[in-house]
Amino acid sequence: LETHGTWQKLGLSEPSWNIPASEPEWLPACLDRANNMFQRDKNHASVIIWSCGNESYAGKDIADMADYFRSVDNTRPVHYEGVTWCREFDYITDIESRMYAKPADIEEYLTNNPQKPYISCEYMHTMGNSGGGLKLYTDLEKYPEYQGGFIWDFIDQAIYKPLPNGSEFLSYGGDWHDRPSDYEFCGNGIVFADRTLTPKLQTVKHLYSNIKIAVDEKSVTIKNDNVFEDLSAYTFLARVYEDGRKVSESEYHFDVKPGEEATFPVEFAVGASNAERIYEVACVQNEATEWAPKGHEIVRGQYVAEKISTETPVKAPLNVVEGDFNIGIHGQNFSILLSRAQNTLVSAKYNGVEFIEKGPKLNFTRAYTDNDRGAGYPFEMAGWKVAGNYSKVTDTQIQIEDDSVKVTYVHELPGFSDVEVKVTYQVDYKGRIFVTANYDGKAGLPNFPEFGLEFAIGSQFTNLSYYGYGAEESYLDKLPGAYLGRYETSVEKTFAPYLMPQESGNHYGTREFTVSDDNHNGLKFTALNKAFEFSALRNSTEQIENARHQYELQQSDATWIKVLAAQMGVGGDDSWGAPVHDEFLVSSADSYQLSFMIEPLN
């Protein structure tokens, strides 16, 4: 039973012609549905709650349905969310249940003498690149009355539609000339319509695990949230990584009874290097089950003793040519051009191979997500798109010495007075390019989605490896389940095929990444002083944002790279107005510095 459209108009409750309400002519149909469901499911052990319906407001007819369930079965509770809108019928439900309630609102209920257990019958609208902030909900498990919720929903709903060339694409509302339409609004699954897995499952898998792991340098704390099972079916693997490379692994077996938590000492075997060190404990299955093979990883915990590169340019003689339009830096097997006219890096040749297709430009915005559009961010943050696309260089500062070349471009941003961004390129005798972009915060401006540089290299550079948080895309509010490590993938694979193309493929906390061709020619990007975020995709931000379907993204003649100081989270409380939580925003009032080094692989 659902009659949403009869009592809610444009998102507002207006029940003047609510159905079924307390109308006697609807009561037989309501009771018939209740009886049919009861007779069908009464002997299924997996059915533990009777629900009177979904989004149908409240009234005597639904109250009579609840009375019917209780009269025929006194062993199962009755659920109905609609009383949220109509509290005089609160007695219908045994469970406090709300649609898309914010974590703070749920916590307020749980901390104010709750009379009923709480379940979010729908929450975390995972439309497109979504699922950010899920941990804010699962953290509520500390309250005994909180019984979790149901992510909306499991799978994208889309239909294959033929194209004139004989291929097919996953279509959504409006693609069949249907009007009115909610367009891609049914693309809200944690599984794609073709039953392949979305990157959103990375976060869900980790946070929904009944085994929680916290690690430090000498111990592991394990919480067993299972109701009946101990941990005898699992092995725990204690590993140490140095700069992302595994140096040791040992096996442990821990006895933690259901519902209990315990801390155990762990002998992590470390190396002698002065590298960044990752202490990790992973929980894996001892034997195969019907749903997973032997050795399947359930969850893992990490502790990182952080150490980011502080590399600086090496002083040695350079061959520099300063012309009217370019500054050329030449050395053994490399030549680099910094342009006075284009106001950026325009050429980087190593071993005769040109890498730069389009030089770095300022970037403040992303290809907006479904949640971004629902929250009104494209309007709120539109000025930053203009600022990135049309910034003007008002000053070029050139420092040329025998052993050093440094060029700084000072950008003025249209629409934002007294806001400057400085981008500096420094080249050393090895041909390494040290890049720094500085934004000095200013109060009173709208926030921006991200800050960094976007540029293009040759399309042949498609092999991607990185040392950062993976294996799927990771964002500030989607870090649970993303583990720091070294990953091998490709430019094609790192882009997630959401129903409507949007921001995708970001990797948070990256220390370094390489992009190469099949002959091992390529570039390495290393974070300096602080980890960055990056993506390497087949299309630019603008191309992705302008496409409505995946097939509209034509094969690009370049590999597009973004290196970012910061990017805001993707949100997920809902897709029709909920903003990204404050702690996951990028504030324009704060200062940001992006610093990294570019060098050839060979």
What feature does the model see in each segment?
Residues 217-226, 434-441:
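Short beta-strand elements of extracellular/lumenal beta-sandwich folds
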Residues 254-262, 585-588:
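Short proline/glycine- and polar residue-rich coil/turn motifs
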Residues 281-309:
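Polar, glycine-rich mid-to-C-terminal structural blocks
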Residues 269-275, 289, 303-602:
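Beta-strand/loop-rich accessory regions of lumenal/periplasmic or secreted enzymes
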Residues 219-252, 263-267, 274-285:
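Beta-strand-rich binding/interaction modules
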Residues 7, 56-60, 86-89, 104-105, ...:
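Flexible loop/turn segments at secondary-structure boundaries
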